[in-house]
Amino acid sequence: MFRGKKYQEAAKLVDKTKLYDPEEAIDLALKTSYAKFDETVEVHVRLNVDPRHADQQVRGTVVLPNGTGKNVRVLVFAKGDKAKEAEEAGADYVGAEELVAKIQNEGWTDFDVCIATPDMMGLVGRLGKVLGPKGLMPNPKSGTVTMDIAKAVKEAKAGRVEFRLDKTAIIHCPIGKVSFGKEKLLENYRTLMDAIIKARPAAKGQFIKSITVATTMGPGIKVNPLKPL
């Protein structure tokens, strides 16, 4: 794959044979950021589990202390008092049948987080084929099927991120923007990694195989998986 001159210059700063500690890795990610826009800093964690087995799934949510720097668009499926609660908490879209119809008929998914009250799941369940592949389906495990709508909306807006394994046993998660600076990014990174470690299933051996930190356009920087925090 051909990479541009700026990428190649940035990549020269990274020792591909070295496993960095988290602070060094984030510092280097900032130094190798060269895009004209405010790049997102991402963490990619490869785990020693088999995602094909239900008892080895790793997923959860965590509120990053400094947010993600992204304007999070929240949709809530609710009626009556819970719909009002969602609106007052700052949800961008609130509704029931009409929103289900819009998603079903138009394939509309211009939102980042989808929350529902438990009584709405019979209706929302019809949207599995649209919302499921995009990771938007409300789920009790991730706190997005709940009666505490206000809390869920506020956490989503504040920078709650959901992490889950992909088919290759890797978790991909943003921890903020380059403009955050090293200290805020490091705090977000440690909060995320702590949550992933706590979500460990009963698998034997070394849990974390590899950790890579990178900006949107920059090179990957490897973190020592034996010292993830």
From Swiss-Prot:
GO terms for biological process: regulation of translation; translation. It comes from the Bacteria. InterPro entries: Ribosom_uL1_bac-type, Ribosomal_uL1, Ribosomal_uL1-like, Ribosomal_uL1/biogenesis, Ribosomal_uL1_3-a/b-sand, Ribosomal_uL1_CS. One of its GO terms (cellular component) is large ribosomal subunit. Keywords: Repressor, Ribonucleoprotein, Ribosomal protein, RNA-binding, rRNA-binding, Translation regulation, tRNA-binding. Pfam families: Ribosomal_L1. Disulfide bonds: none annotated. GO terms for molecular function: rRNA binding; structural constituent of ribosome; tRNA binding. Binds directly to 23S rRNA. The L1 stalk is quite mobile in the ribosome, and is involved in E site tRNA release. Protein L1 is also a translational repressor protein, it controls the translation of the L11 operon by binding to its mRNA. HAMAP family: Ribosomal_uL1_B. Part of the 50S ribosomal subunit. Belongs to the universal ribosomal protein uL1 family. PANTHER family: 54S RIBOSOMAL PROTEIN L1, MITOCHONDRIAL (PTHR36427), LARGE RIBOSOMAL SUBUNIT PROTEIN UL1M (PTHR36427:SF3). This is Large ribosomal subunit protein uL1. It comes from Caldicellulosiruptor saccharolyticus (strain ATCC 43494 / DSM 8903 / Tp8T 6331).
